[in-house]
Amino acid sequence: MEEEVAALVIDNGSGMCKAGFAGDDAPRAVFPSIVGRPRHHGIMIGMGQKDSYVGDEAQSKRGVLSLRYPIEHGVVTNWDDMEKIWHHTFYNELRVAPEEHPVLLTEAPINPKSNREKMTQIVFETFNAPAFYVSIQAVLSLYASGRTTGIVLDSGDGVTHTVPIYEGFALTHAISRIDIAGRDLTDYLMKILAERGYSFTTTAEREIVRDIKEKLCYVAFDFEQELQTAAQSSTLEKSYELPDGQVITIGNERFRAPEALFNPAVLGHESGGIHETTFNSIIKCDVDVRKDLYGNIVMSGGTTMYPGIADRMQKELTALAPSSMKIKIIAPPERKYSVWIGGSILASLSTFQQMWVSKQEYDESGPSIVHRKCF
């Protein structure tokens, strides 16, 4: 029994769910973390209308559904919908029986204790998994980069965290969270495109703007300088073809949208930018570990995929840090999925196999076992 069964690794993000088998180098399934329910109940009898749709199917039928994201800012807020997403992951995406595989799930840093317990309970009681483990997302990203010490800037669709990690343990007191991430940048891009006269309002149109953002946006090395360049010439302008064939032109919006990561004030947020947050997290750590953190700043998550973000981060942190400090930003090309990849590495290690919470341990101790075995 020991060897041949692969563990399942599921990284539940606010925007996308990444799932697959431990030992693989990429997730098998990547789909939107959404559950859709019909807005109008079936008029046509016998149309076989389901009472809920998950992921891509919900996305494609979004015109007639009301869509909900069960994960807000990285934390699960709707457990019934979350259960539907896991069910969909096991049975429709991976096509496995969860009672036959150990399951590794990921959680946001500073996830409430009750949430970990609820997660544990659902995996064992609803899905009857033989074994379970929950791991902090940022720690997995660090593993994926081949490190055990460093600070991870993890920015996805719903939340951004800076998480200092020493020898594999997250230094909880120094973790910072900013509620600015991909979704906010998409909204901001919608707003500034409207100023140019392009109106995007519906949830369907929001997906178009997300695509524009992913294909054309970048981070300016020097924001003021870039604004001047954009004003004086058309070198920075790019065109984008909408689904209906209309072509729109986008100029300084390309770098104005992601600039919000470094200057959240444009979104009306009080928090500091990602560079200040990273710096503040490092400052909260012991003097002796700071050098190791400055030298291992690892980016992870889809919102760190903008061209130019690493160079800009290097520049901003150099200005904040002590002058003698060596600063190194690591931005691996696969960072969009590095949380999942780290989980795949961890769950397939031979030394990890004794770390799983087994069904037997769960039956003896209840959900609180998760705090004793998963750190």
Curated annotation (Swiss-Prot):
SUPFAM superfamilies, alphabetized: Actin-like ATPase domain (SSF53067)
A molecular-function term among this protein's GO annotations: ATP binding
Gene3D superfamilies registered for this protein in UniProt: 3.30.420.40, Actin, Chain A, domain 4
Major subcellular location class: cytoplasm
Subcellular localization, as worded in the UniProt entry: Cytoplasm, Cytoskeleton
Keywords of the record: ATP-binding, Cytoplasm, Cytoskeleton, Hydrolase, Nucleotide-binding
Catalytic reaction equation(s): ATP + H2O = ADP + phosphate + H(+)
EC number: 3.6.4.-
Matching PROSITE patterns: ACTINS_1 (PS00406), ACTINS_2 (PS00432), ACTINS_ACT_LIKE (PS01132)
GO cellular component, one term: cytoplasm
One Pfam family named in its UniProt record: Actin
Function: Actins are highly conserved proteins that are involved in various types of cell motility and are ubiquitously expressed in all eukaryotic cells.
Protein family according to the UniProt entry: Belongs to the actin family.
Protein's name according to its UniProt entry: Actin
Protein species of origin: Thermomyces lanuginosus (Humicola lanuginosa)
